[in-house]
Amino acid sequence: MELAYIPSPARGVLYLGPIPLRGYAFCIIIGVFVAVWLGNKRWVARGGRPGTVADIAVWAVPFGLVGGRLYHVITDYELYFSEGRDWVDAFKIWEGGLGIWGAIALGAVGAWIGCRRRGIPLPAWADAVAPGIAFAQAFGRWGNWFNQELYGRETHVPWALHITSSTDGRVPGYYHPTFLYESLWCVGVGFLVIWADRRFKLGHGRAFALYVAAYCVGRAWIEYMRVDDAHHILGVRLNDWTAIAVFLLAVLYIVLSSRKRPGREEIVEPGASDTGTGADDPVDLGKDEDKATTDKATATDTSTTTDKSTDRGKNEDENEGEDAEPSEKTESAAESAKKV
């Protein structure tokens, strides 16, 4: 028995009365909220309207879930369509089985539809949500822990994952927690994108491409450690080949885009009132209110000064009038004396 290890949950579902709350789905939901929340902050900082990220996510998230499931079912079709299998299980997404490659690809289609409806460029939106997607994946990977799936080779390290379920044909034991490795890697990718965006002012989809490239590096390494059944090409797992191909495409996009359109977009959302301060700068939500207060105070001071000047002029005129009356009386008396 290992002295130290990561225990697996006794079950992957909790019941709130008759309603099942599955750990896998719960992790995905948390990830979506984190991605939308962070993406919204970055979008507003770039000059967009609050709420735009969420509006487009309404399109991107369902498309992404469908794409992720399709990729999994197509690449592991024997789990659902081979002899003795029930094809209906292909629709049971809550039992696990989402391919990130399909989720990103079809999710991008949904995001493109949402962006066209709002009249904004897809690359700018993708840059805003890129680190949030990485953090969302970090949360989502814990769903594999709840389902006791997608772990690595057998090991005796202190952080080994104790697998108690044998539903996938594996012998219960201690294995590399690849879900944890990928979760930590995704956290690092998220912070890398934020730092690089702040340092190099990434725009026109380059922040998103950096996220894709960085994720592929970690995924290729972690995929090599996994021992679950997978298709192989030339002795290499299919997902490794996919990671290599997507990595090269992402790097190529960064290079070509930097030459063709350096810098960031000047306007990310036409008609937005706030031009933004940059994705790396904090958004001063009270700036407009402070400006309005200052303008009001200035107008009040100007009005007060004008009133005082008017009153001062009026008093001077009255004083001049009062001084003129005695003078006129004195002159009249002098003329009378001369006549006498």
Swiss-Prot record:
Region (Disordered): 266-340
Biased composition range(s): Low complexity: 295-307
Single GO biological process annotation from the record: lipoprotein biosynthetic process
Principal cellular location given in the protein's record: membrane
Keyword Membrane: yes
Compositionally biased residues, Basic and acidic residues: 284-294, 326-340
Keyword vocabulary terms for this entry: Cell membrane, Membrane, Transferase, Transmembrane, Transmembrane helix
Binding site for a 1,2-diacyl-sn-glycero-3-phospho-(1'-sn-glycerol): R141
Cell location: Cell membrane
EC number, UniProt record: 2.5.1.145
GO molecular-function term, one example from the UniProt record: phosphatidylglycerol-prolipoprotein diacylglyceryl transferase activity
Name of the top EC class for this enzyme: transferase
Keyword Transferase: yes
Pfam families: LGT (PF01790)
One Gene Ontology cellular component annotation held by this UniProt entry: plasma membrane
Listed transmembrane segments: 19-39, 54-74, 93-113, 119-139, 176-196, 202-221, 238-258
InterPro entries: Lgt (IPR001640)
Pathway given in the UniProt record: Protein modification; lipoprotein biosynthesis (diacylglyceryl transfer)
UniProt membrane topology term: Multi-pass membrane protein
Protein family membership: Belongs to the Lgt family.
Physiological role: Catalyzes the transfer of the diacylglyceryl group from phosphatidylglycerol to the sulfhydryl group of the N-terminal cysteine of a prolipoprotein, the first step in the formation of mature lipoproteins.
NCBIfam families: lgt
Name of the molecule in the record: Phosphatidylglycerol--prolipoprotein diacylglyceryl transferase
Organism of this sequence: Streptomyces avermitilis (strain ATCC 31267 / DSM 46492 / JCM 5070 / NBRC 14893 / NCIMB 12804 / NRRL 8165 / MA-4680)
